Structure formats: structure tokens, C-alpha cells
Amino acid sequence: MSEQKAFNLKIDEQNIAWLGIDVPNEKMNTLQAAFADEMKAIFAQLKDSSGLKGLIVHSLKPDNFVAGADVRMLEACKTAPEAEALARQGQELFQQLSDLPYPVVAAIHGPCLGGGLELALACDFRVCSDDDATRLGLPEVQLGLLPGSGGTQRLPRLIGLLPSLDLILTGKQLRANKAKKLGVVDACVPQTILLDVAKQFVEKGKKRAKQKVTTKEKLLSGSGLGRKFVFEQAAKKTHEKTRGNYPATVAILQVIQHGLEKGMKQGLELEAKRFGELVMSNESKALRSIFFATTEMKKETGSEAKPSKVGMVGVLGGGLMGAGISHVSVAKAKVPVRIKDVSNDGVLNALKYNYKLFDKQRKRRILSKAQLQSKMLQLSGGTDFTSFNRTDVVIEAVFEDLSLKQQMVADIEANAKPETIFATNTSSLPIHKIAEKAQRPENIVGLHYFSPVEKMPLVEVIPHESTSEETIATVVALAKKQGKTPIVVKDQAGFYVNRILAPYMNESAHILLANEPIDKIDTALLDFGFPVGPITLLDEVGVDIGAKIMPILVAELGARFKGPDVFDVLLNDGRKGRKSGKGFYTYKGKKKEVDKSVYKLLKLTPESKLSDNDIALRCVLPMLNEAVRCLDDGIIRSPRDGDIGAIFGIGFPPFLGGPFRYMDQFGLKELVEKMNQFAEKYGDRFAPCDGLLTRAGEGRRFYDN
């Protein structure tokens, strides 16, 4: 029996060659170094085949073109030159495709990403299906890399400098219509006629003519002055976003500029060289570890049991969280939702929230008007329990009040099916207490979403001792369908994310009370890599929420969670944060500025004494300490879950790989030394926990690799 091949060549009666891509035993097509010889042989055959009219490159998979290069092959590279050689191999193969003497057309349906798009860019023409599954992009920057098989050189020459910089620096994915508008593809057609249209391009019998350069493009990339201006502005904007923490963005700008100034050949040489260097960088290794972790987690069910089918979801509470949960249930999980609130205004609020989000998609032409109406018809609500007897999962998002949540359990047990799962979106109350009076405690589980629900990718699944395996499996499956990454955590105060966040927030308050300026503290943590500073975060979450959560953590977990007394002072002055228009900052529309009257209120005289690095480490070290305790207490199942939880839940810097990868990179012995220094200087709250001391003493790490 002949060995299965990834690339299958056929020549039809009209002398058109068809190259079908079908990676054996894989759901998605990816490009792998192992295919190089196979591709070389096919391209040599195609070059020597006289009389061919053209070549159509397409996928034999039903729902994807090429999802990119197989990232796993980078893990085998031990040096930068090894990784550089991989890039050169890809460049040479795609150049052979580009050099074929007749028209080459890529027929694209489904994801066409990374190396897949680079392959398509090496063709003369690209035709794609108008299907929602079709996405085109170069997402390498999200792995701390740059496109290494010609993408940095071909894309700017095809669609111009500015749109190329936008795509390559962000890694954003284009829908089919947008790709056509930008000129990435030449035609966007229904999938049923995709191959016929590709054939028409071949039958025209012409290779692609040299791209006509617009006057604007001549000014921007054709002149030294224009290029200098564009790249200076791009570097400035990129640095504002990345704060210098992502070397890939610097390399991308350098490589594209070099290619435009020195020509494509030299551009490709530098592209391969920088690609090799980036593969070996700590930032890319950390970002790739996140990619592998999330890929693994997609396959996990969180439980031994099989999930039950969820045909309808109930949501209790029409506030911000309830509205967001109802949205991801309809938009992503595609299940109808019934919302219950104590008032019609609450229900209306949730429906309006959903309409606003769907209408935004309509304006961006992601949804048609009919699709928007269809989505809204999946949502209904009222002030009673009508239709709750048809729900399979009810997600409760009411106020953080134990007796109210227990009442919700009783109401659902009285008004829903016996097997209906009750998932509580509490952020601080123990699940076992919410389930205390339940008739069917096995159906009760925590499902902790983060705000805004439609944007934040994490959800914590919190079973209590009596939660059934089937309940866990069902809510994990539902969370995935809602577009979330679920981590299963133990039922203890703060769960995982809030428990590691609390000491971080407390320390920022200690630093503030030592007279460090508010904006200095926030800037230090932004530079460290967090998306927002801790003081801003407290304003966003709400000072009143912080005031509720901290005492629960102190009562359950001990005095180390006791922070400085700032909450009451602020709340007595009407400062709840953004929602009340003032907290540590004042808010006018989208603008915010430090409210200097806070210093007077807290009897402070702001004066910067600490370095940015010391401020950042003072906030981060207690978080790391608590993350280790969570692992050793069984709150999280693995360092991997802890890293994903911190990155997706609170924005721990992705380029550091999460708390546990960062500790490994820092070195546990060095970390213990630093904590001891801080403990001497600032107090026992910095003393390294037993788990950290033991591992450091034994020379262990959290990860083997």
C-alpha cells in the first residue's frame, strides 16, 4: 500500500494541474518541514511538464485551506541558524511555485493563515469562498515571530505598505470580503463555484502583471522620505502599544523596510535571519507555550463523564454580567436564552445590550439585517419563570448576596427540570455554601466569568464536593461553545484568579500609601506588560467590589490578605471608581486623569522614590507567591492552568508565559532571594511560601521544558 501524501498532483484533460493539499491523519492542513522533499519533487515535475495551461492549488479538506506552519517543528530547533534554515526552506519552495511559467491560482476555502497565506501569496492569483469560515491573515506576531516564508516581502508589494503593516503587526485575520477589498484576493465567490472561478483565471493564460503602484503608494513606500515617515510613525505607535516588550514588532518593521529599500532578495535574507533569532527568544517561547496550552485545553473535558446536551440556557439577572453571558450563549454557543430579572427594565437592559453588540457586527458587515433579527429572536425574557422548565443550564448572575443566591437555587429547583444545572457566576462566595440548602447539590457548580464577558476569554469552573462529573463536563463543554477557555478550580475563597489578584492589588495600595504617585504605579505595571495598571483596574472593577471581596479572603485564608485601609475612606467620599465618575481617577467620557484630591483625602504627599522595576516587582512577587500556594493547595490542577488563568483572567503579560513560566525563567533561587530582600525591607507579606522554598532548595522547576 502506497504511503499517503500531503500534496496530491493531478492533471486533467484540459492540461490544468490540480495540487490538492491533504495532510494525512490531521483535521487541519499545516505545513511541515517533513513535506519539503515531496513539494520539491512536485514543483520539479510541474516545471518540466510541457503544455500545462496552469496550476490550481486547493485543499482536499472540507473546511480549511492551510491553517499555517506546524508550530511544533520550531520546538526541535536548538539554535537560531536551525530555525533560520527552516524559513529559508519555505522561502525557496514558495519561490519555485512563483517561478512556474504559467498562471498559478490558489483556491481558498476556510482558514488560510500564516504559512498558508504565504503559500497563496506566492501564487499569481487568489480566489476565496465568501463563507464565514474563510479567514486570511499572518498571525505569526502573536507567537512572537514574523512571517518567515516571504510574507513580509510579498504582502506589501501586493496591497501596499500601510495595510500590510496593519495586518502583519497585529496578526489580525480578514474575512473574505475584506480580503477582496484590500486586494489580498482577486475574487470572492460562493464555495460552490470556487474551483470553476479558479479555472477561469487559469484559462486567461496570463501570469500576474506587475502591480500598478498608486500615487499614494509611490509617496509612502516608493520614496525614501515617505518610507522614513511611515516607519517612524509605525515604530512610535507600536512602541506605545507594546512598550518594547515584543521584539517581533521591531523585527517586522526592520525586515519590511529593508526589503523595500534593498530589494526582495535581501529582504528575504533578513526575514529568515530575524525569524531564526525570534524563534529562540524568551518572548516567543513563552507565547508558543500559551498556544500549545490552549490547543491542549480545547481537547480536554474537565471530567471523566460525558457532557449532556444543552438546548436552552436560562440567565438570572439582566445586569452587565447577565447581559454578556446571554450574548455569548446566543452568538457563540448558538443556543436560545431566556432571561429573568426582578424588573422589566432589567430584561430590557440585557436585550438592548445584545442588540447593540449584534448591530455593531451588522455595521461591520459581519451580520446581515436578517441574521441580526434571527439572533435577537433567540433571546427572550420576563420577570417570572416562564420557559425555565425547558432550560438545561441556568446561569445565575445576581448580586453577591448568599441568601439571595440560595433563594435562586430554590426557585430553579422548583421551576426547572430535575436535571437542570444551576451555575452561579459568583466571584467570591463559596459554591458549597450556595448549594447548602439545595435538594440536588450535584447539579450546582460555579461558573465565574470575567467582565466584559463578550471580550474576556477565561471562565473558572468551580465544582464543590457534591458536584457531579456530568455537571462539570456539561458546563466545560458549554463554556467552550461560548468561546471561552475554561479552567477547573477548587471551591475556596477567591477561587484562583481573584486569589492571586488580591495581594497584587493590596501591594499597589501599600505603595500608594508610601507616597508614590498614582500614575507612576500604573505606568510601572503597564511597562512590565499588564494591559492596565492596578490602580486603574481597581477603578474599573469598582472600589465597592474590592471592599466586599477582601474581607471574605481575610476570613477564609488569613491575615496575609489584609490590605491597607483605603476602601472605606474612598467609599465614604462617594468614590466607587469609573461607574461613579470618580475613584483614584476622574472620568469625563473616555478621558481619565488622576484625581489629585485623593492624595489629600488619604493624607499623602506624592513623591516618586522607587524605580519602575521595584514598583512592578513589589506588586508581582506577592501574586507569584499566592499562585504557588494555589498550586500546592490544589486550587488549580497544574502550572499550565495557572498560567492560562492569569493571562486570560487578569492580563498577566503573555510574553512572560504566565506566573509559573515567569518564575522558571526568573530562577526559583533568585526569586526566593529577591522575596527575602523585600521581606526584610517591606514586611513579612513578601516571605516566600513553603512550596517555593522547597522547590528552590531542590533545584526544581514548574515545567520540565
UniProtKB/Swiss-Prot annotation:
Q: Name one GO cellular component term.
A: cytoplasm
* Keyword ATP-binding part of the UniProt annotation: no
Q: Which UniProt keywords apply?
A: Cytoplasm, Fatty acid metabolism, Isomerase, Lipid degradation, Lipid metabolism, Lyase, Multifunctional enzyme, NAD, Oxidoreductase
* Subcellular location per the Swiss-Prot or TrEMBL entry: Cytoplasm
- Enzyme Commission number(s) from the entry: 4.2.1.17, 5.1.2.3, 1.1.1.35
- Give positions of region: Enoyl-CoA hydratase: 1-190
**What are the disulfide bonds?**
none
Q: Which reaction does it catalyse?
A: a (3S)-3-hydroxyacyl-CoA = a (2E)-enoyl-CoA + H2O; a 4-saturated-(3S)-3-hydroxyacyl-CoA = a (3E)-enoyl-CoA + H2O; a (3S)-3-hydroxyacyl-CoA + NAD(+) = a 3-oxoacyl-CoA + NADH + H(+); (3S)-3-hydroxybutanoyl-CoA = (3R)-3-hydroxybutanoyl-CoA
Give the residue ranges for region: 3-hydroxyacyl-CoA dehydrogenase: 308-705
The signal sequence is none
Please list the GO terms describing molecular function. 3-hydroxybutyryl-CoA epimerase activity; enoyl-CoA hydratase activity; long-chain-3-hydroxyacyl-CoA dehydrogenase activity; NAD+ binding
Tell me the InterPro entries matching this sequence. 3-OHacyl-CoA_DH_CS, 3-OHacyl-CoA_DH_NAD-bd, 3HC_DH_C, 6-PGluconate_DH-like_C_sf, ClpP/crotonase-like_dom_sf, Enoyl-CoA_hyd/isom_CS, Enoyl-CoA_hydra/iso, FA_oxidation_alpha_subunit
This protein's pathway: Lipid metabolism; fatty acid beta-oxidation
Q: Where exactly is the site Important for catalytic activity?
A: E118, E140
Q: Which Gene3D superfamilies match?
A: 1.10.1040.50, 2-enoyl-CoA Hydratase, Chain A, domain 1, NAD(P)-binding Rossmann-like Domain
Subunit structure as annotated in this protein's UniProt entry? Heterotetramer of two alpha chains (FadJ) and two beta chains (FadI).
Query: What family does this belong to?
Result: In the N-terminal section; belongs to the enoyl-CoA hydratase/isomerase family. In the central section; belongs to the 3-hydroxyacyl-CoA dehydrogenase family.
Which HAMAP family does the protein's record reference? FadJ
Fetch the PANTHER family from UniProt. Answer: TRIFUNCTIONAL ENZYME SUBUNIT ALPHA, TRIFUNCTIONAL ENZYME SUBUNIT ALPHA, MITOCHONDRIAL
Q: What does the function comment of this entry state?
A: Catalyzes the formation of a hydroxyacyl-CoA by addition of water on enoyl-CoA. Also exhibits 3-hydroxyacyl-CoA epimerase and 3-hydroxyacyl-CoA dehydrogenase activities.
User: By what name is this protein known?
Assistant: Fatty acid oxidation complex subunit alpha
Look up and give the organism this protein is from. Vibrio vulnificus (strain CMCP6)
